[in-house]
Amino acid sequence: YVVDFSGHTIEAVNKALKELKKQGMKSLVLDLRFNPGGLLTGAVDMAKLFMGDKQMIVYTKGRKKDFYQEFKTNAKAPYPDVPMVVLVNQGSASASEIVSGALQDNKRAVVAGQRSFGKASVQQVLPLSGGAGLRLTIAKYYTPAGRLIQRNYRDKSKADEGGIFPDIEVEVDPEQEIKVFMQYNKVVYTPGKKAQLPEMTEKDPVLDKAVLYLTGKLTLEQAQKEAAEAKAAKEAAKTKKAASKKETQGKKT
C-alpha cells in the first residue's frame, strides 16, 4: 500500500520488496488507491522496478516540440517477472496514474478497481509583479500507448477521455471503501510501532478480486464478464426505480 510518491517512497518500497522476496513472494498487489501522486522521479523509479530494459514509461507532449520528453527504463528490472495487479480508484492521481498506465500498457500488470482521477499535466509558473505568479499548463502526460492521462473536466463531450481505466472494474460503496482504508492507515500512520496488519473487519472486494486473479481462481475474462453483468444489473435497477417513481408521481396527480 503506497500512500504517495515522496522522496522516501522508493527506498521504502525497495525495502519491502526485498523482505517479501526473502519470504518467497510469488505474486504482488501494488495498492495505489487514494494515492494523490507526488514526484515524477518517484513514479519513473517505481515503474523501473518491474519493467524490462528500454521500455517506455511515460512521455509528455505540448504545443511546442520542446515540450516533448520521453521517460524510459534504462536497465533490467529487479522484479521483471513477478505476477502483478495494481489497484486504483478515483483517488489515484498523477504519479499513481503514470505507474499504473505504464505497467498496464506494457502488459506488465493487470489494473483493478475504478477509473483513476485523471490528473497529469506539466505546469510552469510565470512570475508576475507583486510576488504573484501565473500557473500555466505547457504539456500533458501520455501513457506508452498514447493515452492522455489528464481528464477534460470542462468539455463533457470528452468525458470518456483521461484517467486510467481498470482491466478488472470493481464497483465499491464509497463509505465501505473509506472504512477499509481507515484500517490500512492504522499501519501506515502509527509512528514508533512495528507495522502489523490490524484485524480486517471490513471487506475489500477490490483486493479480493486481485487475489482471486493472481491465484488462478478467476480469469481476466471472467472478471470482466462479472463486472459487465454487475453494471447492467445496476443500470436496470436504476431504470426500474426511476420508472416506479414516475408512476407514483402520476398517480398522485
At which residue positions do the language-model features occur?
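C-terminal "post-core" interaction segments
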Residues: 1-253
